[in-house]
Design a protein with these regions (language model features):
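A generic structural signal for residues located within well-ordered alpha-helices
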Residues: 47, 128, 155-158
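Helix-centered, glycine/charged polyanion-binding patches within enzymatic domains
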Residues: 64-153
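Charged alpha-helix within mobile-element recombinases
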Residues: 139-140, 156-167
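Polybasic low-complexity intrinsically disordered regions
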Residues: 1-104, 161-164, 171-174
Length: 174
């Protein structure tokens, strides 16, 4: 394959304005051991919640036999993801979710009749586990080029993330 035709470069080079200035956001999905399963690179102004379905659609994990797995059994996410659209998408695809609700959503649901608010003890125990995704990000950002986004093009930054994630897979005990 020709290096000039290797992939479409986004028009904004995955650099967008956010509170801290021009920045890039990496959206990733990892397994329980903190190994990257899929990731996307977008501009800094893109909300995490809008990229959940797109990021989950990138998962492809090869097994011993058959076609690769493309869906997790369960998704554990933080308070940035509890939108109705995300929960509906997860239900449609048969993915169980553990996503705590934000305080403003809980207060809104208390004012309205309907399903009671219950995060449940089993959900709390499941969510209480170590923050694996944050540690995965920290492990990837030990590479200075990824932490500082020293690449001009998004595809080069994406390739650096891919290399760091691969090395992380190789050094993590299975």
């Amino acid at each position: 394959m020709n290096y000039k035709k290797s992939g479409a470069e986004p028009a904004d080079h995955a650099i967008g304005r956010s509170r801290g200035g021009l920045t890039t956001k990496s959206h990733l999905v990892c397994d329980g051991k903190g190994r990257v399963l899929a990731f996307l690179v977008t501009g800094g102004q893109v909300a995490d919640t809008s990229m959940l379905a797109t990021t989950l659609e990138q998962i492809s994990v090869a097994g011993a036999r058959g076609r690769p797995r493309t869906r997790p059994d369960r998704l554990i996410a933080d308070k940035g993801y509890p939108s109705k659209a995300n929960r509906a998408w997860l239900r449609r695809h048969g993915i169980a979710a553990t996503i705590p609700e934000r305080a403003d959503q809980i207060a809104h649901r208390r004012r309205r009749p309907g399903r009671p608010i219950d995060f449940g003890e089993d959900q709390r125990q499941r969510y209480r586990g170590p923050n694996v995704v944050e540690r995965c990000f920290n492990r990837l950002k030990q590479w200075r080029g990824i932490a500082m986004r020293s690449d001009k093009y998004a595809r080069n930054y994406h390739a650096g993330l891919c290399l760091a994630a691969t090395l992380h897979w190789l050094t993590t005990t299975l």
